Structures are given as C-alpha cells and as structure tokens.
Amino acid sequence: MSFVPGQENAGGRSSSVNRAGNGILKKTTWADQTERGPNNQNRGRRNQPKQTATTQPNSGSVVPHYSWFSGITQFQKGKEFQFAEGQGVPIANGIPASEQKGYWYRHNRRSFKTPDGQQKQLLPRWYFYYLGTGPHAGASYGDSIEGVFWVANSQADTNTRSDIVERDPSSHEAIPTRFAPGTVLPQGFYVEGSGRSAPASRSGSRSQSRGPNNRARSSSNQRQPASTVKPDMAEEIAALVLAKLGKDAGQPKQVTKQSAKEVRQKILNKPRQKRTPNKQCPVQQCFGKRGPNQNFGGSEMLKLGTSDPQFPILAELAPTVGAFFFGSKLELVKKNSGGADEPTKDVYELQYSGAVRFDSTLPGFETIMKVLNENLNAYQKDGGADVVSPKPQRKGRRQAQEKKDEVDNVSVAKPKSSVQRNVSRELTPEDRSLLAQILDDGVVPDGLEDDSNV
C-alpha cells in the first residue's frame, strides 16, 4: 500500500473547512502559484503542469520532480543548510513514522540582470523528497551527493525506500512545510509560505466579517481570478531594490575637505573607547602616536584604520563585550583631575589586561600571523609608521632660505698661492719700492696688481 501525504488513514475524517475532498491542505503557497496557471478560468480542463524549480533535465527531455512540500529558501549568504539528527522531515497527515525519511535537495535558481547591467544570482531553495523519489531516487540514504542533505525520523528504517507515491501537481497541491515541535530551522533560511496568506484567503476572511448582507458580493469576489503573482516575484523585487541601492551606494562619492573635517570631528567628539579610525580620521589622531603602550599598527594600517583590507581578519580575534568584562583582569584606578584652573572632577580609568588564545586550526591562521607580525611594534622598525615628517616652512622663510642657498652655491675661484692673495689688495709705496729693487729695470708695471701678471 502506497501512502499519499496529506490524506488521512482509512477511517479518518477530513475537515471540510481546511481540506478539500482529497484531504490536501488548500492553503495557497508560493510553490502552488508556481505550479498553477495565472488564473482558474480553465474549468473543466486538465491543468497542464508547468515546470517548477525542481524540474530536472534527463537525456534531453524534461522530467519534472514535484516535491510534496513547499520549499525552504535561503536569504543570508554563507549559511549552511542542516538539521539536527532526527529532525528535518516535514509533517504530513497519513505518513507513518517508518516512512518519514528522505533528503532535502538544493535547487540553484536562475540569475537575473540588474538595472546597471550586472548579473545577480538568487540564493538557492531547498525541496524535500522522500527516500526513493525525486531527482536522486536511486541513491541510498547517506550517500555523499553535492546539494543533498539527508534527514530521517528516529523510528524510520533508512535501509528501505519510502512507499510514497509521486505527486501529480494537477490533482495534488503542495503542502505547506511544517516540522515537529522542537525542530530548529537552519539559520539564514525561511519556509516558503510561512507567515504569508494568499489574496484569496484574505478576501474570504474579509467577506465573512462583513455579515450576511454582503454574501452576494463576497461570492462574486471569490469568483475573481486568482492572483497573478509570478513565482519568486518577492525575491526579484527585493533583489532589484537592493541592486538599485547598491548601484547608488557604489557610485564614488566626492569627499571634500569640509566633509572630511566634519567626519573627523564627529569621531573625535566620541569617547576614546568608542572611536573608529578610518581614512578621514587616522589611527594616530584617534589614539595618539605609537609607542610601548600603543604598539600596534604599520604605516598603511595607521592611515586607513579599520578601512584597511587586512583589518577584518584581525577583527576575528577581538573579544566580545562579555569576554572583555568576564575574561579580563579589570582594575579601577582614580586619576588626578585637571590643573588648578580647570573645574574639579573625578577621573577614573578602567584598566584591563587579558589574552586571546588561538592555534593553527583557526581559519586564516597564516594570514593572521602575517598581519600581526607586520603591525606589532612596527614603530620600532626603520622608517616605521611613527616617523614624523618635518613641518612645512612658511613662504617668507622658504624664500630667504632659497636665496641663502643660491649664495652658498656660487663658485668662487680660490687663490693658488699666498702671493696671489696678497696681490689682490692695493700696493703701498713701500711695496712698489721693494719690488723696484727686485726687478731688473727698476720699474713696476702698471698691471702688477692683476693676478695674471704675477
């Protein structure tokens, strides 16, 4: 005997309020809208099932694999799809515990083009299939398959296939996914259709609240075509909005001196322990020069602060607020207040000391060690980050210095001997008389004062 999810066992009664004649829940879900046409005007004709997110290609032909349940969609990147052992099998009436076994299949959804021309990939959606059905019907429980997560009830026999019929979307609608109490849904995922009501159910509830005088109007409303909301429209709209915001946010913003000054002043107005250094307000403006008590930061990281590309991996080592208070040694110290001319106030310091322990199994260990070695005590290295550039000179002083340099750079011919140095001065009568005695003709030439005649 094959079991049909959503149908009561023999002898059971199905509620006329929540179920139709076949016992299937009639709550409209996104999965149902995927499988049904845009309206219900094709009465009397067999609905042609559309290809759903679980449609799989097989040898050139399309073979649809319809899950009995609505999907689970991922909305946060980087999250893993997983359930605890014994959890993860959706609840369905008429399915005994021994048949509650199967797998969740990851469907990588299509991408779309954003207004700025970029391709965006929708996050995947997961669908449940009983063991022995679906796209991996021939797989055994626990096989290592990419994009497959196996789940089973603690009472289920995973060595045999589930005796569950395949779902025909023309006669059976998808069942809203529900789990047993205590089941923990994977973080970063949500169940399709949870917390959402279809437009038809909303209009029906409104018509019932209006009273008997408006029954004719409510019945006419119920004959309205079903909502033409396309599958994944909510995700597409959200993605388009985010893409638009991302486009605007991604445009380069012009940073003026005034805006940079305002950002810097806003940061410096905060308490010291609440400041976040960045390009507009570097590390040394926030926390002072590097030294023995503040010994972290190389030249590049001191300029960029937390905007440095290497900073996020270091942030993994930062303690949480709880670790800071409960995992550190704290000491409250009263400091001297300001000078005599300043108002009297009590100043305290909450001094702390602690340690962050990690080993080589930490993800990114090699990179963390490299960044730490480059930035610890970087101020002690030659040409380190704490080298202060000379202050610029004023214009008047700079011009005077340039003139002085020009005078200093003038090349002056040096005398070759002491005689040449003496000739450069004016000769006295005594000098002329002495020279006349030395010369044969007794006459001192007029050009004797010139260095070239000596």
UniProtKB/Swiss-Prot annotation:
Keywords: ADP-ribosylation, Host Golgi apparatus, Phosphoprotein, Ribonucleoprotein, RNA-binding, Transcription, Transcription regulation, Viral nucleoprotein, Virion
Keyword Phosphoprotein: yes
Protein's GO biological process: symbiont-mediated activation of host NF-kappaB cascade; symbiont-mediated suppression of host translation elongation
Residues annotated to bind RNA: R109, R125, R167
GO molecular function: RNA binding
Region (Dimerization): 267-383
Cellular-component GO terms for this entry: host cell endoplasmic reticulum-Golgi intermediate compartment; host cell Golgi apparatus; ribonucleoprotein complex; viral nucleocapsid
Biased composition (Low complexity): 193-212
Annotated spans, RNA-binding: 56-197
PTM info: ADP-ribosylated. The ADP-ribosylation is retained in the virion during infection. Phosphorylated on serine and threonine residues.
Domain CoV N CTD: 260-383
SUPFAM superfamilies found in the cross-reference section: Coronavirus RNA-binding domain (SSF110304), Nucleocapsid protein dimerization domain (SSF103068)
Region (Disordered), start-end ranges: 1-62, 160-179, 186-230, 271-292, 382-428
Transcription regulation is among the record's keywords: yes
CoV N NTD domain segment(s): 64-193
Post-translational modification Phosphoserine, affected residues: S162, S170, S194, S389, S424
Subcellular location: Virion; Host endoplasmic reticulum-Golgi intermediate compartment; Host Golgi apparatus
Principal subcellular localization: virion
InterPro entries: N_prot_C_CoV (IPR044344), N_prot_N_CoV (IPR044345), NCAP_bCoV (IPR043505), Nucleocap_CoV (IPR001218), Nucleocapsid_C (IPR037179), Nucleocapsid_N (IPR037195)
UniProt function note: Packages the positive strand viral genome RNA into a helical ribonucleocapsid (RNP) and plays a fundamental role during virion assembly through its interactions with the viral genome and membrane protein M. Plays an important role in enhancing the efficiency of subgenomic viral RNA transcription as well as viral replication.
Similarity annotation: Belongs to the betacoronavirus nucleocapsid protein family.
Name recorded for this polypeptide: Nucleoprotein
Lineage, broadest ranks: Viruses, Riboviria, Orthornavirae, Pisuviricota, Pisoniviricetes
Gene that encodes it: N
